[in-house]
C-alpha cells in the first residue's frame, strides 16, 4: 500500500511545475521567426532545438552553422506534432500561430526585440534564462569609441535611395564602430542624388539584393559609382541589421576593421 502510494506521489510530482530555482531546462524548443532562429543556434544546448522556422531557408539567411538544424513548415499542425515544451518568438512575428499555440496550452515565450545596443545584452540574457542557461554568458557590449570629429562618414543606403540617419539602431551601430553617420537627420530619409554626388561619403554600406530590382537603381547610378568607387562600397548581410543580437557585436567589429583599412 505504501509502495503504491509512493509511486502515485512520484507520478504526480512529474506533472507539477518545479519549485523556485528547480525548473528543468526545456528539451524541445521551437522557433517561429528568423531572429529567434539565430539566437537559438547561438545558445541552445545540443539536441535542445526541436525545430527552427522556415524563414532562414526562405530568405537564404542563417546564422551559425548552415546545415544540420531541423525545421518546421510554419503550420500549427507541424509545430504541435513536434511536442515543444517551449516556443520562442519575437514580438511582431507569427502572431496568429502564437495565439493558437497558447490557446492549446503550449508555453510560448515572446522575446523583446532590442531597439538599442544597450538592449542587446538584455535580450541575450532573457533567452539564456528561457533555455536554462547562464545569463552571464551574454556578450559584453563593444566599448564606445572616443569622439572623433574627423572620423570618416559612412552612409547606410537601402532600396529606393532611403538612408539611415541618427536616432536609429543602425545609426548607433555606425557610431559604436567609430564612424560618423553621413546622414545627420533623424530616422530614415530619402536622398537626393545630386546632393549626394556633390558631397559624397567616405564609404557606403549597401546590402546587396538577392535579385535585380528597380528599387536598387539609385545605388547603381553612374555618377554615384564614380564619386564613391567600388572599394568604398561595403557589403554585409542585411539580416544582421534586421535581427539585433550578439552577432551585432561582430558587425561592429567588421565596421571597425573597415574603418581602420581606410586610414
Predicted features by range, described:
Residues 18-19:
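N-terminal signal peptide c-region/cleavage motif recognized by signal peptidases
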Residues 27-44, 130-178, 241:
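Basic- and aromatic-lined ligand-binding clefts that recognize polyanionic substrates
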Residues 27-92:
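A short, structured surface patch at a secondary-structure boundary
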Residues 53-58, 65-68, 164-189:
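Alpha-helical, coiled-coil/dimerization segments enriched in small aliphatic residues
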Residues 4-8:
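N-terminal export leaders
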Residues 75-84, 104, 192-203:
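Short helices/loops that flank or line small-molecule/ion binding pockets
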Residues 67-77, 94, 114, 186-194:
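Short helix-initiation/N-cap motifs at beta->coil->alpha
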Residues 27-28, 95, 118-138, 209-263:
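Structured C-terminal subdomain patch of bacterial secreted/periplasmic proteins
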Amino acid at each position: 500500500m505504501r509502495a503504491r502510494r509512493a509511486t502515485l506521489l512520484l507520478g504526480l510530482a512529474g506533472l507539477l511545475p518545479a519549485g523556485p530555482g528547480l525548473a528543468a531546462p526545456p528539451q524541445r524548443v521551437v522557433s517561429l521567426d528568423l531572429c529567434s532562429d539565430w539566437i537559438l543556434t547561438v545558445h541552445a544546448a545540443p539536441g535542445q532545438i526541436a525545430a527552427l522556422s522556415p524563414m532562414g531557408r526562405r530568405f537564404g539567411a542563417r546564422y551559425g552553422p548552415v546545415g544540420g538544424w531541423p525545421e518546421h513548415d510554419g503550420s500549427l499542425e507541424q509545430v504541435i506534432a513536434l511536442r515543444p515544451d517551449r516556443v520562442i518568438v519575437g514580438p511582431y512575428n507569427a502572431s496568429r500561430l502564437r495565439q493558437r499555440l497558447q490557446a492549446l496550452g503550449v508555453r510560448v515565450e515572446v522575446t523583446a526585440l532590442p531597439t538599442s545596443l544597450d538592449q542587446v545584452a538584455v535580450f541575450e540574457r532573457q533567452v539564456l534564462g528561457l533555455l536554462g542557461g547562464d545569463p552571464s554568458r551574454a556578450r559584453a557590449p563593444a566599448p564606445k569609441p572616443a569622439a572623433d570629429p574627423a572620423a570618416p562618414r559612412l552612409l547606410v543606403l537601402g532600396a529606393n535611395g532611403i538612408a539611415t540617419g541618427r536616432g536609429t539602431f543602425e545609426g548607433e551601430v555606425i557610431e559604436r564602430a567609430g564612424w560618423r553617420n553621413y546622414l545627420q537627420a533623424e530616422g530614415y530619409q530619402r536622398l537626393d542624388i545630386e546632393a549626394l554626388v556633390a558631397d559624397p561619403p567616405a564609404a557606403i554600406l549597401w546590402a546587396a539584393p538577392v535579385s535585380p530590382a528597380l528599387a536598387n537603381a539609385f545605388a547603381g547610378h553612374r555618377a554615384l559609382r564614380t564619386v564613391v568607387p567600388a572599394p568604398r562600397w561595403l557589403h554585409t548581410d542585411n539580416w544582421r541589421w534586421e535581427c539585433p543580437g550578439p552577432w551585432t557585436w561582430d558587425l561592429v567589429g567588421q565596421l571597425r576593421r573597415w574603418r581602420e583599412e581606410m586610414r
